[in-house]
UniProtKB/Swiss-Prot annotation:
Organism, as annotated: Arthroderma benhamiae (strain ATCC MYA-4681 / CBS 112371)
Annotated GO CC locations: extracellular region; membrane
Cytoplasmic side stretches: 544-668
Protein name, as recorded: Kelch repeat-containing protein ARB_01230
Kelch repeat residue intervals: 62-108, 125-176, 283-331, 340-395, 396-445, 463-509
Length: 668
């Protein structure tokens, strides 16, 4: 009985456990499965251990960071490729220990996880080109698509299976565009174009490429014309000659020196845009190489955008060591007379297995093409790195990520700031007020060709000492130190601008976020003072002229008085010439004059007896002779020389304080 009761209870307990399993545990498992689905749509994480080989772009004060490779802890060795999509706010200030990163949604509706591609940008969109897929674990690439991110709608758009169009110095039309990786990218939003130079193709970039086939390095340049923009170098099959919604592609393979033996294949280099010289500006290609050779730094490849041709230009000065995977940006002097290219970091892979990373900063000043090392000894310089990205805003270079080798366990958050004007590494980014959407120099805002990111930039003193001029520009070295033989550098010149005198607007000029393009009290006060001094100088000049005229009249009057006295032997004072109509002061002149041996003293001269009496005399309307003694009358232009005839020599102060009376005297 007890056994049966126990068995009954045992069965009841079993049933209860089954109910709990079905009613609680299984739903929880279902919730976890749904959570994994949602996690795929969660915002991208901002906390990492290391980050490198990502793609970045700035649009209107926001830095966008997509994909690349990252680890979450020091022990992670695989699964480093990611599709994280982040923004970094450059419109407000922050410290490098806590940059203002925001994770954007990621999911199945966006690009695949790739690294070492490039993020072009227009004024409202991002365009992700190229990149390679994971090699650990090995991942088969998908067919190439250009991925466009619409900033206004916060959504990704896939442009599938693009093909080339025919154009100048380019390959034939209707060739499928390939995905390359580790090339050098650049874009010019005002032109509505992006470029990707060199790189490589292999089994991690191209679908169907066998891993047994060696990597192929490139020296071609792929060009993409953004939707809605024009491009005279490529055939556009629309009535208005503007690219359609899919854009237009061109593969430039025969531009100038590009098809010559001296123009080598390369990957892991950088491109920099320089306004001026050609009709649409020029692009510089620096650094990079292959698994066997490196590109030298004493000769720079120069691409003329308008003619789609490559040239070479020799440099001067001590050159940086050969390297791959550096980063580079450009900043323009306020007057445009010089542009400085900043090149940071990179690595040397030769000999194989003994790679070394760099953390040095170099400046290539254009148009002199002179290398200048930016000394940063004693500063908090970031650890040496390669595969990082650089972007410039408010004349501050923002360095993101980078491969730092095996000795450093983590490099978090891995974002650093370099002041391009002061040549110093900072512990914070400083937002400036009063800029513009393109962040151009204030003197260049009316010209769409002005270089973005240069707002507040001042030419460093070490650069001034080499190219001449001052912090606003005025470079005296306006041509390459090694004379060019051909191309836009031989025939063109930089775009220059007029710089109005203003207070500095660089990050050194005020507290974070204070800016300098708002009301500037010092500038206003200086302007007011300068204006007042200018008015005062004009007035004093006018008073000086009045004083001299009146003094001359006084001396003429005095001489006439003396001649009259001499003519009467001192018996009486004859009438003044008709032009004078007022009385002499009872105080007299106390003046002694002499003619030959005759000395005449005219003292205390008055029209009537009595030292303290003052009267006005009127003259006839004809102005011929003095009339009889009359009653005092209101001052008028007909009786305008009281002070002069009062016997007092005019003073400069008196004329300055009463210029109207002096004018009446002169006009009479």
């Amino acid at each position: 009985m007890e056994v049966g009761r126990f068995a009954s209870k045992s069965a009841s307990m079993t049933y209860l456990l089954l109910v709990l399993l079905v009613g609680f545990i299984l739903p929880q498992q279902g919730q976890h499965a749904h959570a994994r689905t949602l996690a795929r749509r969660d915002n991208s994480p901002t906390d990492i251990c290391k980050r490198w080989s990502q793609q970045t772009a700035i649009v209107n004060g926001t830095l966008y960071i997509y994909g690349g490779r990252s680890t979450t802890d020091a022990s992670q060795k695989d699964n480093t490729w990611n599709d994280n999509f982040l923004t970094l706010d450059l419109k407000s200030s922050w410290g490098i220990s806590a940059p203002k990163l925001t994770g954007l949604p990621r999911g199945d509706n966006g690009p695949p996880p790739v690294s070492n591609g490039y993020l072009w940008n227009s004024f409202s969109s991002l365009f992700l080109y190229g990149g390679e897929f994971s090699d650990n674990p090995a991942t088969e690439p998908v067919d190439f698509s250009l991925w466009e991110y619409s900033i206004p709608s916060s959504s990704w758009i896939e442009h599938k299976s693009p093909k080339t169009s025919s154009g100048e110095n380019s390959a034939e039309a209707n060739i499928p565009v390939q995905r390359s990786a580790e090339g050098a990218g650049i874009n010019v939003p005002d032109l509505g174009r992006g470029w990707y130079f060199g790189g490589h193709l292999d089994g991690y970039t191209t679908k169907g490429w066998s891993q047994s086939i060696p990597r192929v390095y490139l020296k071609s340049m792929i060009e993409y014309t953004f939707p809605g923009h024009t491009n005279n170098g490529v055939k556009i099959n629309t009535d208005d000659k503007r690219a359609g919604p899919e854009g237009v592609w061109r593969n430039i393979t025969e531009g100038g020196l590009q098809d010559s033996a001296g123009f080598t294949e390369r990957a892991d280099g950088v491109l920099v845009y320089i306004p001026g010289f050609g009709k649409e500006g020029i692009i510089l290609g620096l650094a990079g190489g292959t698994n066997a050779t490196f590109t030298q730094m004493n000769v720079i490849d120069v691409f003329d955008i308008a003619s789609s041709k490559w040239y070479k230009q020799a440099t001067s000065g001590k050159t940086p060591k050969i390297r791959v995977n550096p980063c580079a940006v450009a900043a323009s002097a306020a007057d445009g007379s010089s542009t400085q290219v900043y090149l940071f970091g990179g690595q040397n892979l030769i000999p194989y297995g003994e790679q070394i990373q760099y953390n040095d900063m170099w400046i290539l000043s254009i148009p002199s093409f002179t290398w200048i090392e930016a000394k940063t000894d004693g500063q908090s310089v970031p650890p040496a790195r390669a595969g990082h990205t650089c972007n410039i805003w408010n004349s501050q270079i923002v360095v993101t990520g980078g491969y730092v080798g095996q000795d450093l366990s983590c490099d978090s958050p891995g974002i650093y700031v370099f002041d391009a004007s002061e040549l110093t590494w900072k512990n914070q980014y400083t937002a400036l007020e009063g800029g513009n959407d393109l962040n151009q120099q204030a003197s260049q805002t009316r010209d769409s060709s002005g270089l973005g990111g240069s707002y507040g930039y001042r030419v460093p003193k070490v650069v001034q000492s080499v190219i001449g001029g001052d912090e606003t520009g005025k470079a005296t070295q306006t041509v390459p130190a090694v004379a060019p033989t051909d191309g836009p550098l031989a025939t063109g010149q930089p775009l220059t601008y007029t710089v109005l005198p203003t207070a500095g607007s660089g990050p050194h000029a005020g507290s974070p976020g204070s800016g300098s393009d708002g009301p500037n009290i010092a500038a206003i006060v200086a302007g007011v003072i300068a204006g007042c001094l200018g008015v005062l100088a004009i007035y004093l000049g006018f008073v000086t002229w009045l004083y001299r005229r009146r003094l001359a009249i006084y001396k003429s009057h005095l001489a006439a008085t003396q001649r009259s006295s001499i003519g009467s032997y001192g018996d009486k004072i004859s009438s003044f010439p008709p032009r004078y109509s007022d009385h002499m002061s009872s105080s007299g002149l106390g003046t002694t004059g002499s003619t030959g041996n005759l000395t005449v003293t005219t003292a205390r001269m008055s029209w009537i007896s009595g030292d303290n009496q003052r009267h006005n005399h009127t003259r006839s309307s004809s102005g011929g002779n003095f009339d009889h003694l009359a009653q005092p009358e209101r001052p008028s232009t007909s009786s305008s020389v009281e002070d002069l005839l009062a016997g007092q020599e005019p003073t400069f102060l008196g004329v300055m304080l009463n210029p109207r009376q002096t004018l009446r005297v002169i006009n009479q």
